[in-house]
Regions:
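The alpha-helix within a helix-turn-helix
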Residues: 33
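Short, charged recognition helix plus adjacent turn
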Residues: 71-92
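A short, Lys/Arg-rich alpha-helix, primarily the initiator
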Residues: 1-24, 72
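DNA major-groove recognition helix of helix-turn-helix/homeodomain DNA-binding modules
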Residues: 55-74
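Residues within the helices of the helix-turn-helix
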Residues: 19, 30, 61
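Recognition helix of helix-turn-helix/homeodomain-like DNA-binding domains
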Residues: 38-53
């Protein structure tokens, strides 16, 4: 899968990665929402996968683009790997 067609799985890990990516760039999730006339609750619903309709998917795409897809992909992959390690340790 190339970075161009990489699909993020909505959920807590993606939400944390998006928030972290904004912070890493000196911005905030809430500030982006305010600048873009988006209710933070709607943005959270999109990142957590609670809003999977056309509007929710479009909002998620905007958030991913604003966060920086390449940097976000790295942050997301790191968080997924950390979670997988936690699961492995818990299952042992």
């Amino acid at each position: 899968m190339t970075p161009k067609n990489f699909e993020f799985q909505p959920g807590a890990i993606l939400h944390d990665a998006i928030v972290g990516t904004f912070r890493a760039h000196g911005r905030s999730f809430e500030a982006w929402c305010k600048e873009n006339d988006v209710l933070p609750s709607n943005a959270r619903n999109a990142t957590f996968g609670q809003s999977r309709g056309p509007k929710g998917r479009a909002l998620l795409a905007r958030l991913i683009e604003a966060a920086g897809p390449e940097f976000l992909r790295l942050a997301y992959a790191r968080r997924i790997a950390e979670y997988a390690d936690t699961v492995k340790k818990g299952a042992a």
